[in-house]
């Protein structure tokens, strides 16, 4: 781990070629992340994917260090969670009929405000979480280990881009040409969308997440669709429409309960320690620990001025008013701490839950139009998403000995580029497909945004939501993944089934690798090395399949917009 009081120079880490590669990758990953989040209701961390391709391209251009690759992938992945923050909140306004009240400029201001607040907050909390508390940040740690494993090069590039090409071509055949169907094995079950979604991306998500977590996801799907909708209607307890409302309410309650439980169990007990740690840091820091300017005093001024500027901008440009703007700005700093703690301990960043919490707090203090509440949730979700990404990158940098200031500057570059791209993609998608394409059982399920919309407009079944909320809290305390179960309850069954099939492929893949190693009679050291290479190959191919379909989906959306503009 790097020592912040004796950090390495930025020379050779934040480079021109790295910035160019990072920005190009950021554009692609941000666009595909927005599409993935809307289409699938989930967004896997892109850090490992970005790390692999960053090192690959840098090596094509000559010698490259792991530190340069670390900074490059920091730039490259920055926009993904900005896109996630928008995709998990803003489409809720489209579902409620407010699409014509949200412009591209509004979307960009929301993304930019969240990005800047997230950057300022992480400059403050970096030392506490990475150095003093030294949290695990499993995704960031995995990215560092992946860079080390990939350094030797080899077949990585061919595997990655070959799988991307296959998924991209397949997506064109399915979505543009209609040669292959979107759904397979469809069954007519009242109230249940039973099918296998013909999607390399969703299969890859199941593969990347792994069998055990997706098994809980699928269990939730079975409970909601066959336990409540099929079983409940067969028993005459309620009709199909009522059952579907119950399922949505239960799923939302489970996810909300999980988010609140994370705050209650893991965040609040740490807040006092975090504040004490930050205060202690401020008395002992040197300018070497500055991440923004190289001077702690100048950093303090920049953070204060930047925070005030964002409060003024959102108050005027988004018409939130002074009191809501101040509340949003202050609570965003609190929620980024929550986000960092959650990512550091669990690898999960429930950004939309944090957005919901602040949105409800603001709604209690101010009378705002519903569409404005989505702006608030979006700002907070973007800030928390970016904070999670930044802290994971900082963890990878600590493992590899990268200069954290170089990383922070890279994150600022990628975050601002990501805000531009994410806003453009969101507007392009709603223009191409129309606001009616977003929501449960629609082309873009936008599960998290649907939760936000429901919290704004009302809950179908308050008792079931309350029951799910309580169950989510209890389950988290018992170590049961309520978020995954709630996601399965909430999402259409065809998505859960397809992801489960992908996780089954991962289970078979791991068992085959173990059987092969056992038959080979390898030593423990050779077995570990071979298994690491095998796992990396699976990661690269699955990431390529996911990225290929995502990128093509965005390209098709832009083509559709272009054709509509041409008449």
Question: What residue ranges belong to the model's regions?
Answer:
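Alpha-helical multipass membrane-protein architecture
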Residues: 1-567
């Amino acid at each position: 781990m790097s020592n912040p009081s004796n950090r390495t120079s930025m020379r050779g880490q934040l480079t021109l070629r790295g910035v160019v590669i990072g920005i190009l990758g950021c554009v692609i990953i941000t666009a595909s992340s927005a599409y993935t989040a809307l289409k699938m209701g989930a967004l896997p961390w892109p850090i490992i994917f970005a790390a692999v391709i960053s090192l690959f391209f840098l090596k094509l251009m000559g010698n490259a260090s792991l530190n340069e690759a670390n900074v490059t992938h920091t730039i490259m992945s920055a926009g993904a969670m900005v896109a996630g923050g928008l995709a998990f909140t803003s489409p809720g306004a489209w579902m409620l009929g407010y699409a014509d009240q949200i412009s591209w400029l509004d979307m960009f201001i929301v993304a930019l405000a969240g990005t800047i607040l997230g950057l300022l907050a992480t400059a403050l909390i970096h030392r506490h979480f990475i150095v003093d508390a030294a949290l695990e940040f499993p995704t960031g740690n995995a990215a560092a280990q992946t860079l080390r494993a990939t350094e030797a090069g080899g077949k990585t590039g061919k595997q990655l881009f070959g799988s991307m090409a296959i998924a991209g071509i397949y997506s064109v055949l399915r979505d543009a040409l209609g040669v292959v169907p979107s759904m397979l094995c469809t069954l007519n079950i009242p109230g249940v969308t039973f099918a296998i979604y013909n999607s390399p991306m969703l299969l890859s998500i199941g593969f990347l997440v792994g069998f055990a977590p997706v098994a809980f996801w699928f269990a939730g799907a079975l409970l909601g669709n066959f336990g409540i909708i099929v079983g409940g209607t067969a028993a005459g307890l309620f009709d199909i429409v009522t059952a579907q409302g119950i399922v949505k309410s239960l799923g939302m309650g489970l996810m909300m309960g999980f988010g609140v439980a994370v705050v209650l169990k893991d965040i609040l007990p740490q807040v006092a320690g975090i504040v004490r740690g930050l205060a202690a840091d401020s008395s002992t820091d040197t300018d070497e620990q500055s991440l923004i300017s190289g001077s702690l005093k100048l950093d303090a001024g920049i953070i204060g001025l930047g925070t005030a500027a964002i409060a003024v901008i959102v108050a005027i440009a988004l018409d939130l008013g002074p009191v809501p703007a101040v509340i949003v700005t202050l609570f965003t700093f609190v929620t980024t701490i929550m986000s960092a703690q959650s990512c550091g301990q669990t690898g999960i960043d429930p950004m939309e839950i944090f957005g919901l919490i602040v949105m409800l707090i603001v709604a209690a203090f101010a009378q705002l139009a519903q569409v404005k509440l989505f702006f608030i949730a979006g700002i907070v979700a973007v800030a928390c998403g970016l904070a999670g990404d930044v802290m994971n990158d900082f963890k990878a940098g600590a493992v590899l000995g990268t200069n954290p200031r170089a990383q922070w500057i890279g994150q600022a570059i990628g975050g601002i580029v990501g805000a531009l791209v994410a806003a453009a993609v969101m507007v392009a998608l709603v223009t191409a497909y129309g606001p009616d394409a977003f929501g449960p059982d629609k082309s873009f399920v936008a599960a998290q945004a649907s939760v936000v919309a429901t919290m704004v407009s009302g809950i179908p079944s308050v008792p079931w939501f309350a029951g799910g909320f309580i169950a989510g809290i209890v389950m988290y305390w018992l170590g049961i993944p309520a978020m995954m179960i709630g996601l399965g309850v909430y999402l259409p069954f065809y998505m859960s089934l397809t992801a489960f099939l992908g996780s089954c492929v991962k289970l078979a893949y791991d068992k085959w690798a173990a059987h092969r190693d056992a038959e080979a009679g390898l030593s423990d050291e050779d077995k570990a090395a071979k298994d690491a290479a095998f796992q990396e190959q699976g990661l690269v191919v699955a990431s390529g399949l996911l990225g290929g379909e995502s990128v093509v989906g965005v390209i098709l959306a832009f083509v559709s917009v272009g054709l509509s503009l041409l008449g």
